[in-house]
Amino acid sequence: MDRMQKDDILERLVAAEGFCVGHSRSEDTRAPQSCDHWSNPVLLERAAYLRKLARFGEGNASEVVKEYPGYCTLLSVHLRSSDAEVNEEFAELLIVLDGRATLITGGELQKAYRIGPGEHRGANISGGTMQELRTGDVIHISAGTPHQLQLACEKTFSCLIVQIAQAVHP
């Protein structure tokens, strides 16, 4: 995929105005309304590009689709199992676009280390619950919940992630 094609896909991902029925701009004093729409074919086309990046990198690739006040959307492609992680400051809503994986949630991170403010990673999870994920599934992971994606050998998993700011209260 050349640079022009990549830019065209990004433009279609971000320039979503006018796709939503029932959301029109009005001339009143309320805050402007908007609606962003990313079709499954456009997301899968972009995921194909990320899959190429993942092959030449560490086996996973992701990028921010769009940032909003209080949350952001990311496109993520996995060619291998991910590290276990805990995000203290945001919840995640995963929409599975393509593939299968096992999601482990809960339990405790093993060999944990800090990667940034409110973010920790680890080698794996001990004592978590396993769930099988498939294309079309929607998953909510609360802030502070350890989680990890495990893939079978030579499988690909693509998802849209909505990260939502959420304080964890003790």
Regions found by a protein language model. Name each.
Residues L109-K111, K155-T156:
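Short, surface-exposed beta-strand-loop junctions and turns on beta-sheet-rich folds
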Residues E132-A152:
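Conserved metal-binding segment of the jelly-roll/cupin
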